[in-house]
């Protein structure tokens, strides 16, 4: 029987209940691992363990439940992931407020340690800057970045084996991942064709269900 050379596992971190996200993810036909209602500092190491014991999968795909994406977005990154150890899409930073003008991409490493920092300590690029870069080089949409906020990030198995998911005071896994990749000499890339919608609202705190609903790990083969 024919088996695809690239076999990603979409790892979904779901601390909320978001119908818009659930509708989007249902349209992507891929094996999924749901990490439901765990705090971040437990969710990521647990997901790493679950992925590593499933040796048939080639890539760990980070997907958070506040990111709206399409099957096209997923397929573009899947088509490129064998060429890069780490490749992601990108999105707006917030959806409302001052930071809605900014992207998830930074051309500098995040503050370290990140736990006591604020968004003002990051150096996120404006969306218009990223759009200009894309339009200036339409034939070269993939760029190297120090940090991109884990926007549907494809990590090769060898990267997941080498790099643990660390946290600082229970948060900031994405920031520390960027530092750990940098320190290990592993480059990460963003495909500018894959722009998604980040549902991060300035005026409303997230309706987290961590501690309110039972946590669970659910494997969902397609």
For each of these PLM feature ranges, what is it?
Residues 56-57, 83-86, 186:
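Short, high-confidence coil segments that cap the C-terminus of an alpha-helix
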């Amino acid at each position: 029987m024919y088996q695809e050379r690239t076999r990603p596992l979409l790892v979904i971190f779901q601390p909320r209940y978001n119908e818009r996200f659930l509708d989007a993810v249902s349209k992507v036909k891929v094996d999924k691992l749901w990490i439901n209602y765990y705090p971040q500092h437990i969710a990521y190491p647990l997901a790493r363990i679950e992925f590593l014991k499933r040796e048939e999968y080639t890539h760990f795909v980070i997907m958070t439940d506040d990111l709206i994406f399409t099957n096209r977005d997923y397929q573009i990154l899947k088509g490129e992931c064998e060429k890069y150890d780490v490749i992601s899409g990108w999105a707006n930073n917030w959806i409302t407020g001052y930071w809605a003008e900014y992207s998830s991409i930074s051309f500098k490493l995040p503050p370290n340690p990140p736990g006591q920092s604020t968004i003002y300590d990051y150096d996120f690029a404006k969306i218009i800057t990223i759009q200009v870069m894309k339009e200036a080089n339409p034939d070269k949409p993939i760029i190297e970045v120090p940090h991109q906020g884990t926007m549907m990030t494809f990590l090769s198995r060898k990267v997941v084996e080498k790099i643990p998911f660390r946290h600082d005071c229970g948060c900031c896994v994405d920031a520390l991942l960027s530092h750990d990749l940098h320190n290990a000499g592993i480059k990460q890339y963003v495909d500018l064709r894959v722009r998604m919608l980040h549902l991060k609202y300035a005026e409303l705190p997230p309706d987290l269900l961590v501690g309110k609903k039972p946590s669970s790990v659910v494997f969902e083969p397609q």
